[in-house]
Amino acid sequence: MSERQPQILDLEQVIKSKAGKKAKYIPKFVINWFKKFVHIDFINEYLKEGYVGVEFCENAVKYLGVELEIAGLENLPKDGRTYTFVSNHPLGAIDGVTLGAVIGRQYDGKIKYMLNDLLMNLKGMAPLGIPVNKLGGQARNLPKLVNEVYHSDNQMLVFPAGLCSRKIDGKIQDVEWGKSFIKKSRETGRDIVPSIGPDHLYAYRLSAAFR
């Protein structure tokens, strides 16, 4: 069990840090609106518990009241090797915490994600993440960080679309997947294990209501 790290997330500071010199142009009411939009009080109530790593994911699932129906768990490899687990991305952040909870528990917490760098502000998620900037240029050391993880003893969790699923021609589907995970998996001798989350309209609309 990891040592707990209770946290109160200062969302205003996160926004200002991300915006840099442009922060002074962001009206206060916009920041206040965004706090309500992301339910920051609800988030901070959970962050006070201080869960870290896979425990953060597992308890976030419980806190959100999500009931998981998992099929094929018995098929997960248990041969001591490392794998690349790939998944569609229909529901947003909840995809990450649920996949992390399930895969992380099966592999003793030895998992890593490619994470939106904003999520690295969550102490509980940060140890699991490789930060990816969705709003600007990438850090120069990103290729090095990715390479290190693929060569490590961690299981790699990847959402190849890089974005949440979209409604396209009346169907909920991922945008085109990036292929770098295939190249890196080949280079490091990792087999790729696919998984799939709910892609029906009801789940999509429900998740969209909370985005």
At which residue positions do the language-model features occur?
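Membrane-anchoring hydrophobic helices of lipid-metabolizing enzymes
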Residues: 1-83, 96-98, 108, 126
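Amphipathic coiled-coil/heptad-repeat helices and related helical stalk/stem segments
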Residues: 69, 139-143, 177-178
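Generic beta-sheet signal
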Residues: 81-87, 154-160, 190
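A cross-family acyltransferase "interaction/gating" segment
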Residues: 155, 162, 166-211
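Catalytic core of membrane glycerolipid acyltransferases/transacylases, capturing the structured
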Residues: 29, 39, 80-137
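Short amphipathic alpha-helices and their capping/turn segments at secondary-structure boundaries
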Residues: 144-151
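Short, flexible loop segments at the rims of nucleotide/cofactor-binding pockets, characterized by
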Residues: 46, 60-66, 132-138, 170-171
